């Protein structure tokens, strides 16, 4: 987790602005936010909380102001990962620190087994495709208009797997070796 927080801090230092950081759970989100706050208390941050009401959601989104700076921590697949419009400088980048897979459960295992029996690719249909839909949806918070440019950090080693890469949009310019400091394409 130190590496993940270091990437967030370095990207923020090199390109100050508004960012969203997405995590697989509230526990993971809380741990990462606490680590960033401990090591870099100068970086403003705000967090999605479980069961946020309308007013709390509005307050979270109000933190994204033109020429603002900070990191909003949210859960991938949650209320801030889709249906949120933050064009231009309201949001200049996102960090996705998870592949977004559905948690293991008996129901999910049965669904995957059924799809595997029918199509021979149960894991892909039941797990990977929905996960990548959530990732693309969250990434879409950064690019809201044709003029928007920004950074998207996929901070999970599983994004290097061929079966995952082939599910990402073809127009994404992927650079597995890119480090903080680069300009957006």
Task: Mark where each language-model region is.
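ASCE RecA-like P-loop NTPase motor cores
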Residues: 1-185
């Amino acid at each position: 987790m130190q590496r993940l927080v270091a990437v967030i801090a370095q990207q923020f230092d090199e390109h100050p602005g508004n960012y969203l950081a997405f995590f697989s759970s509230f526990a993971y989100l809380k741990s990462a936010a606490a680590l960033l706050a401990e090591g870099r208390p100068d970086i403003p941050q705000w967090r999605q909380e479980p069961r946020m009401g309308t007013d709390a959601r509005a307050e979270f989104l109000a933190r994204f102001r033109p020429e603002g700076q900070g990191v909003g921590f949210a859960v991938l697949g949650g209320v801030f990962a889709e249906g949120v419009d933050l064009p231009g400088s309201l949001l200049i980048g996102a960090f996705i620190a998870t592949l977004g897979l559905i948690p293991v459960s008996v129901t999910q295992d049965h669904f995957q087994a059924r799809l595997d029996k029918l199509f021979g690719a149960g894991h892909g249909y039941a797990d990977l495709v929905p996960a990548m839909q959530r990732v693309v949806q969250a990434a879409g918070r950064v690019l809201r208009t044709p003029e928007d440019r920004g950074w998207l950090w996929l901070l999970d080693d599983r994004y290097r797997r061929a079966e995952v890469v082939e599910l990402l949009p073809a127009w994404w310019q992927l650079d597995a070796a890119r480090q903080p400091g680069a300009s957006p394409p």
